[in-house]
Amino acid sequence: MLPGYMASATEIIAEGRQARAGGDLAAARSRYAAAAKIYRDRNDVLAYAHTIRHVADIYQQESNSGEAKPLYEESIELYRSNLNTKILDLANALRPYALLNEAQGNLELASKLWEEARQLYSSLRVQPGVFECDEHIRKLQQL
């Protein structure tokens, strides 16, 4: 890197992806968090929401639901409050939050999240997403 050069959020995310693929979750989380700060400082709400969702995913990989949960909640709230949100981004944020709630025994909330994600995936004809949601909804109905 050149002296005085500051990496862009996109470059930092690429570093995070590489670290995650290599199994260095702490470095990956750190890089995604650095990119999220850039997006937040620039008031790029949707990029920030997307990036903190990835930070939450990494926390989940590290079995740290306590850190993941508020990031998923913030990401979902930001997506829901922005008219430019892509439906797939919201669905992809609901999915891991549903998994987290299901694992924590918050079955009523998990069921609602799976239903909402299913509707969104269905509206986009993302069949793998619909099928996964259906599996979880069926499982939760049997409990």
PLM ranges: what are they?
Residues 5-41:
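Alpha-helical segment of the N-proximal tetratricopeptide repeat
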Residues 10-11, 50, 89-92, 112, ...:
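Residue register of alpha-helical TPR repeats
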Residues 6-7, 46, 88, 128:
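Residue signature of alpha-solenoid helical repeat architecture, marking inter-repeat boundaries
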Residues 19, 39, 79-81, 101, ...:
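Eukaryotic all-alpha helical interaction scaffolds
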Residues 3-4, 43, 85, 125:
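Structural signature of alpha-solenoid helical repeat scaffolds
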